[in-house]
Curated annotation (Swiss-Prot):
Catalytic reactions of this protein: L-glutamyl-tRNA(Gln) + L-glutamine + ATP + H2O = L-glutaminyl-tRNA(Gln) + L-glutamate + ADP + phosphate + H(+); L-aspartyl-tRNA(Asn) + L-glutamine + ATP + H2O = L-asparaginyl-tRNA(Asn) + L-glutamate + ADP + phosphate + 2 H(+)
Alphabetically ordered keywords of this record: ATP-binding, Ligase, Nucleotide-binding, Protein biosynthesis
Domain of life: Bacteria
Family: Belongs to the GatB/GatE family. GatB subfamily.
NCBIfam families (UniProt xref): gatB, PRK05477.1-2, PRK05477.1-4, PRK05477.1-5
Organism name: Zymomonas mobilis subsp. mobilis (strain ATCC 31821 / ZM4 / CP4)
One Pfam family from the record: GatB_Yqey
GO annotation, biological process: glutaminyl-tRNAGln biosynthesis via transamidation; translation
Record-given protein name: Aspartyl/glutamyl-tRNA(Asn/Gln) amidotransferase subunit B
Coiled coil: none
GO molecular function, one term: ATP binding
Enzyme Commission code(s) on record: 6.3.5.-
Gene3D superfamilies for the chain: 1.10.10.410, GatB domain, N-terminal subdomain
Described function: Allows the formation of correctly charged Asn-tRNA(Asn) or Gln-tRNA(Gln) through the transamidation of misacylated Asp-tRNA(Asn) or Glu-tRNA(Gln) in organisms which lack either or both of asparaginyl-tRNA or glutaminyl-tRNA synthetases. The reaction takes place in the presence of glutamine and ATP through an activated phospho-Asp-tRNA(Asn) or phospho-Glu-tRNA(Gln).
Length: 490
């Protein structure tokens, strides 16, 4: 993989990036209380006495949140720590009623793992340092009143997994590939929905620069970036900013910054705190979390087939190209849609599987893009898609007729077989009828017949096109080609 290098006035610079991804755990209730976690609820309608930090209220660990964190750790091949502990991260802010956040600094639930990413067809392993579980904070609302700010505590206490990568990322493209791959795994596992636009997955981006072979530079952290595109843009801008500062004789200050996506730049928020600034100490209200081996085994057995394994199966068993297999398995919903298509064929061979995959990634994806929809909102069902592919495979429809049928399916929602029957779109392989049409075309174009026989082979396509047009696109192309070759060589 070619190194990503930024050129400055004093030479070449390398980017060093580490990502801290905050993923909201899918659970009906919060990490330490029974309050609900539904997105979009009325402000402060999902707040328990624990979330509001009422005196005397003690936290109780939600088993499901722990289970989801363990399953996520297993999915990235990480070490699961049999004993982990909760710590208090002390700071004051209006959206944190307790005055501290319950987190895991010293003994996280998940240890080291890794993620295999693909950038431009080349694979690279990115190390993951840890995953710990912690509480989310509430949300400040500044647009409700001209003179006051309000706080919504619905989000306070919701379980987050903080997934911390090692500083192994070396380009914006690698950062994008890492987040997309991590999001895919979380969705396959079902531990986070990965909706960055809703805030259920967001990234803190740590960026530094250095000359090749030199030690790591001073890093700046860009907080709460909420899209893959913005992560990549923030890294690019911040790296160039740091290079400019250093080359102008300045010094990079360790600080927290925000990314302004409208201006495409980062700006300073505050000086970066270290762990000692938060005065971490073990939470006295929570005992150490001890996980029996049977619990970890149960989590392992509950895991689905993960994207890398599924991709390899598609390549080896279904004969899909690595690219097509990657496109389908990159998204859990797309892979499930494809699997549902294959179920229609009972025991699909490689030819049918390839045809189904190609139709899905070209025809259906193209149509959905035009409609502004995704695979979960497709107007065509997997069964209907499989039926259409099957009609082409058994010769009922030609490729061009299949496209016509597909357009009607998108508009009407009808099954392809019904459309073919009602509109008389069935492909014909009647050699007598096809030969009769071809004879007329050849008779009407004697000059072109002579030119073809004199060596102008490209005219063969002209005769095919004329035949298909004369038969309304319903002639079997293979039969047309066969008869044309016979008559033109006579």
């Amino acid at each position: 993989m070619e190194k990503y290098i930024l050129e400055g006035a004093t030479g070449s610079w390398e980017i060093v990036v580490g990502l801290e991804v905050h993923a909201q755990v899918i659970s009906k209730s919060k990490l330490f209380s029974g309050a609900a976690t539904a997105f979009g609820a009325e402000p402060n309608s999902q707040v328990s006495l624990i979330d509001a930090a009422m005196p005397g209220m003690l936290p109780v660990v939600n088993r499901e949140c722990i289970r989801q964190a363990v399953r996520t750790g297993l999915a990235i091949g990480a070490v699961i720590n049999r004993v982990s502990k909760f710590d208090r991260k002390n700071y004051f802010y209006a959206d944190l009623p307790q005055g501290y956040q319950i987190s895991q600094l010293y003994h996280p639930i998940v240890g080291e793992g890794s993620l295999l990413i693909d950038v431009d067809g080349e694979e690279r392993e990115i190390g993951i340092e840890r995953i710990h579980v912690e509480q989310d904070a509430g949300k400040l609302m500044h647009d409700q009143h001209p003179d006051k700010s309000y706080v919504d505590l619905n989000r306070a206490g919701i379980a987050l997994m903080e997934i911390v990568s090692k500083p192994d990322i070396r380009s914006p493209a690698e950062a994008g590939a890492y987040i997309r791959k991590l999001r895919a795994i979380l969705r396959y596992v079902g531990s986070c929905d990965g909706n960055m636009e809703e805030g259920s997955m967001r990234a803190d981006v740590n960026v530094s620069v250095r000359k090749a072979g030199e030690p790591f530079g001073t890093r700046c952290e860009i907080k709460n970036v909420n899209s893959v595109r913005f992560v990549q843009a923030a890294i690019e801008y911040e790296a160039r900013r740091q290079i400019e500062v250093i080359e102008d004789g300045g010094e990079i200050i360790q600080e927290t910054r925000l990314f302004d996506h409208d201006k495409g730049e980062t700006r300073s928020l505050r000086s970066k705190e270290d762990a000692h600034d938060y005065r971490y100490f073990p939470d006295p209200d929570l005992l150490p979390l001890e996980l029996p081996e049977s619990f970890i085994d149960e989590c392992r057995e509950s895991l689905p087939e993960l994207p890398d394994t599924k991709r390899q199966r598609y390549i080896t068993q279904l004969n899909l190209t690595p690219y097509t297999a990657s496109v389908i398995t990159a998204d859990h919903e797309t892979a499930a849609w494809f699997e549902a298509m294959l179920e229609y064929f009972k025991a699909p061979d490689a030819k049918i599987a390839t045809a189904a995959a190609n139709w899905l990634t070209s025809d259906l994806f193209g149509a959905l893009k035009k409609l502004g929809r995704d695979i979960t909102d497709s107007p065509v069902s997997p069964k209907q898609g499989a039926e259409l592919v099957g009609l082409v495979a058994d010769g009922t429809l030609s490729g061009s007729l299949a496209k016509q049928v597909f357009e009607i399916m998108l508009e009407s929602g009808q099954d392809p077989a019904v459309i073919v029957e009602e509109r008389g779109l069935k492909q014909t392989s009647d050699t007598g009828a096809i030969e009769e049409v071809i004879n007329k075309i050849l008779a009407d174009n004697q000059d072109k017949v002579e030119q073809y026989r004199s060596g102008k082979d490209k005219l063969f396509g002209f005769f095919v096109g004329q035949t298909m047009r004369a038969m309304g696109g319903k002639a079997n192309p293979a039969v047309v080609n066969e008869i044309l070759k016979k008559l033109l060589s006579a």
